[in-house]
Amino acid sequence: MFDRVEIRIKSGDGGSGKVSFRREKFVPYGGPDGGDGGDGGNVYLEADSGLYSLLNFKHKRVHKAANGENGMGSRCTGHNGADLVIKVPVGTVATIVEENGQKRVLADLAADGDRTLVARGGQGGLGNTHFVSSTNQAPMLAQKGQPGGEYELILELKLIADVAIIGYPNVGKSSLLSLLTAAKPRVANYPFTTLSPVMGVVERTEGTFVMAEVPGLIEDAHLGRGLGHDFLRHISRTRMVIHLLDGTSDNPIDDMIKVNSELYLYDASLSERPQVVAVNKIDDELVQLRREELTETFKEAGLEVFFISALTGEGVEVLLDKVAEKLAILKAADAPETETDQEIKVFRPAPKGKMGFHITRLEDGWQVEAPEIERIIEHSDIEDLEVRRQIMVLLKHRNVQQALIKAGAVIGQKIITGRLEWYL
């Protein structure tokens, strides 16, 4: 199973605003009519019950949403970029890798249709109609669209099953699963026959439930030995486990303790999963002879044990009755409470066009960091004297010069704002 992948996602860039003036016969002073740029497309992850692995991402690692279109004349706003919805299997956990290398879990898509926003598209830039003032009736300024977000993303698929069958390699997990369900796992008499988790549906009169065989766990699996890390994480998505033991083993209870220890060392919460213990191969004469001894040993440890044969089906129905009983209790406990007084979240848009700035002292002058103004500079012809004059007026209206003087700047010093160099 292809159940872990690293991809790169990028939301769409915002379209740039337009510098345009109304040109119409008999309207000599039409004024500015440049439209705003469209917003870039967002990137979403959505759980889809029709998908079962992350194989679709094996050969396509980069996923981009569409950019917003640039603004146009006649106050026409550019089209927003189309959103990108990336479909993933139910049970996918998405983790963002920050620039500093730290990882942050973004979402756990545990149900069909679950959707989460991964990267918001860049906001479209403002057209020159937004820069009209009493002193500037013909603005030559427009704003470049914001760039979209770009992230490294780790997708991990964890099984979602009601019951997991765990145990040492070659204890009969595949045989038991194939006996109880229509699943067809690979069955052979050697360790690690099953190399990926296999799921099947158990049908009973009181209902159905999903059962998964987790490939064999061995000592030091929590350190990645064998196929440990690949499979231990799947157990976290199950309600309970059938701990299957080999009745012909020298010490079945010791085998159980070692596997449970691996669960605890990987994730302490896994060792708290409800377990039903079953000893397989009761059809073997040796196991029949040891049955009373094993029953007493497990009883002393406070454990109820079921003896079964995955080969002949002996004892399996009794085991299933116990599993179904425990499962019904767990499902009832997990049922959501019907609350009417739920908090309603209100989402409000961020203020558009807010132009804050930050001043930094340099060796040979000052730097003014003003993202919104820098987007205007980036989109403007700063070699044009009229454009430069209008930018300076804009900086003055934002009290940038006043703040520079207050910070200690003196007349004649060089100021850098984006790609524009100017002097106080």
Curated annotation (Swiss-Prot):
Enzyme class: hydrolase
Listed GO MF terms: GTP binding; GTPase activity; magnesium ion binding
Domain Obg residue range list: 1-160
Record GO biological process: ribosome biogenesis
Domain OCT: 349-424
Binding site for GTP: 167-174, 192-196, 213-216, 280-283, 309-311
Location of the protein in the cell: Cytoplasm
Annotated keywords: Cytoplasm, GTP-binding, Hydrolase, Magnesium, Metal-binding, Nucleotide-binding
Domain of life: Bacteria
GO cellular component, one term: cytoplasm
SUPFAM superfamilies (UniProt xref): Obg GTP-binding protein C-terminal domain, Obg GTP-binding protein N-terminal domain, P-loop containing nucleoside triphosphate hydrolases
Enzyme Commission (EC) number: 3.6.5.-
Amino acids binding Mg(2+): S174, T194
Cofactors: Mg(2+)
InterPro entries: G_OBG, GTP-bd, GTP-bd_Obg/CgtA, GTP-bd_prot_GTP1/OBG_C_sf, GTP1_OBG_dom, GTP1_OBG_dom_sf, OBG_GTPase, OCT_dom
Span of domain OBG-type G: 161-328
Subunit-structure text: Monomer.
Purpose of the protein: An essential GTPase which binds GTP, GDP and possibly (p)ppGpp with moderate affinity, with high nucleotide exchange rates and a fairly low GTP hydrolysis rate. Plays a role in control of the cell cycle, stress response, ribosome biogenesis and in those bacteria that undergo differentiation, in morphogenesis control.
Annotated HAMAP family: GTPase_Obg
NCBIfam families found in the cross-reference section: Obg_CgtA (TIGR02729), Obg_CgtA_exten (TIGR03595), PRK12296.1 (NF008954), PRK12297.1 (NF008955), PRK12299.1 (NF008956), small_GTP (TIGR00231)
Name this polypeptide is given: GTPase Obg
Species this protein is from: Dehalococcoides mccartyi (strain ATCC BAA-2266 / KCTC 15142 / 195)
